């Protein structure tokens, strides 16, 4: 059991966490023909949009209610109604995600009442689903905001079971053959989600991914050239069939509450996994798919498993005993920590952006809830060879002279990293090779001493100072 160490500093010096509204917006960006609408100031939403654009290198559909100093005091309900009506009239979306921010939460905005006022004033937009999410900036992190959005999507868009799901025969009549629900966590990249879909379909199953960022944020050109709404993602019509699925697969402990809500509404049995990185986690997931599909392990999956095992043998000497420092949101931190621990590496520092109860189960002495400054201090104190963090950890890695493995959100200083697959047999194998190569090619050398009396050329003195 790991000890969870809470922060004692008065402020975050080098912030690790990203706000809840960004996480909630990310969840809606994984739905087809959707517009996330943040109820807050224009500048805050612009900053969030810039975060997404730098990470994904693509246009991002994101709007704001544009609260200002006047509406912050006297109320911004009219802004919300006007924004919803404008988006419905101009863009004709299937779904609008109405996300509160720290500003509107501190103001005390009554979002459900405002949505009711919009419905009363504009009944002709009744077909557009408006999903409100309470996601203040002052609590949680990207992962928790994302989880709140998924929970809201389940509550507002997944129909309740119309028959008694305790009666098997009556339920079987409405079950869609071989369809499974998949609750996808915030830690998964577009590459991860694509790999997960292929993994499930290899067993002859049809997954309904909620949400599906692989179909909307994987970086692809469209014939229209530009769309004001999300292009690609989970269809609203597919979400409305989730109560007829055969089973539900839940990835990540952050989605436990959303999984509970889905089980309450549909009565469908669910299978929960902390992560899908590493041989043991992959084997557990594959065995579950075998049980659901009622088939033996497909040869293609067995082939990938054998490739991963070979990679583990190849990389054991480089990763065994390596000293690693990891900083991420809770789900990703747990997945990476177990991955490195399974390969014989020593996780000397584990820093989470926000507190989560399941972090106590990790195979480390302590998990610090803090920022990247905490990571840097711990990594320096324990001589970490590898820093695993988002792009904001690059400066800490440079100062420490350690290798830097980029993962999480945001990644803005490396092309293609946002789309890498980390999960499954193939993703774990790729992560093994990348980590081993980083450690093998990164040398923490001591610079040679040069006497002040050394006689050398001006160029040599510039490149090799005393």
Describe each region flagged by the PLM.
Residues 1-466:
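An N-terminal assembly and electron-transfer interface module characteristic of large anaerobic redox
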């Amino acid at each position: 059991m790991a000890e969870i160490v809470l922060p004692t500093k008065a402020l975050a010096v080098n912030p690790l966490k990203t706000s809840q509204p960004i996480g909630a917006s990310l969840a809606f960006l994984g739905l087809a023909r959707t517009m996330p609408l943040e109820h807050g100031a224009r500048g805050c939403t612009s900053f969030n949009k810039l975060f997404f654009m730098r990470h994904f290198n693509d246009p991002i559909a994101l709007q704001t209610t544009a609260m200002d100093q006047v509406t912050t005091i006297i109320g911004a309900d009219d802004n919300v109604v006007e924004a919803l009506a404008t988006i419905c009239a101009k863009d004709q979306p299937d779904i609008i995600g109405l996300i509160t921010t720290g500003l509107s939460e501190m103001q005390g905005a009554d979002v459900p009442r405002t949505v009711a006022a919009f419905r009363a004033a504009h009944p002709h937009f009744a077909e557009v689903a408006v999903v409100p999410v309470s996601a203040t900036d002052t609590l949680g992190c990207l992962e928790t905001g994302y989880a709140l959005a998924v929970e809201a999507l389940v509550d507002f868009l997944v129909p309740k079971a119309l028959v008694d799901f305790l009666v098997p025969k009556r339920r079987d009549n409405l079950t869609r053959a071989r369809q499974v629900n998949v609750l996808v966590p915030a830690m998964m990249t577009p590459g991860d989600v694509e790999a997960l879909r292929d993994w499930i379909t290899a067993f002859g199953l049809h997954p309904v991914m909620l949400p599906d960022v692989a179909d909307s944020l994987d970086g692809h050109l469209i014939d229209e050239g530009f769309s004001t709404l999300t292009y690609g993602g989970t269809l609203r019509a597919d979400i409305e069939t989730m109560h007829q699925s055969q089973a539900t697969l839940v990835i990540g402990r952050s989605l436990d509450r959303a999984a509970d809500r889905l089980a309450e509404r549909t009565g469908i049995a669910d299978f929960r996994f902390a992560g899908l990185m590493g041989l043991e986690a992959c084997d557990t997931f594959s065995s579950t798919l075998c049980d659901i599909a009622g088939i033996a392990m497909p040869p293609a999956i067995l082939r990938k498993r054998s490739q991963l095992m070979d990679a583990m043998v190849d990389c054991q000497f480089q990763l065994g005993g390596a000293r690693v420092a990891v900083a991420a949101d809770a789900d990703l931190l747990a997945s990476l920590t177990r991955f490195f621990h399974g390969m014989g590496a020593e996780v000397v520092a584990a820093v989470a952006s926000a507190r989560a109860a399941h972090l106590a189960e990790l195979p480390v002495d302590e998990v610090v809830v803090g920022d990247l400054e905490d990571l840097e201090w711990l990594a320096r104190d324990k001589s970490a060879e590898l820093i695993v963090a988002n792009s904001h950890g690059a400066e800490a890695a440079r100062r420490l002279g350690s290798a830097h493995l980029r993962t999480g959100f945001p990644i803005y200083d490396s092309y293609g990293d946002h789309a890498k697959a980390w999960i499954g047999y193939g993703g774990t194998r790729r992560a093994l090779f990348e980590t081993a190569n980083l450690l093998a090619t990164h040398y923490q050398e001591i610079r040679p001493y040069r006497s002040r009396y050394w006689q050398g050329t001006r160029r040599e003195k510039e490149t090799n100072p005393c």
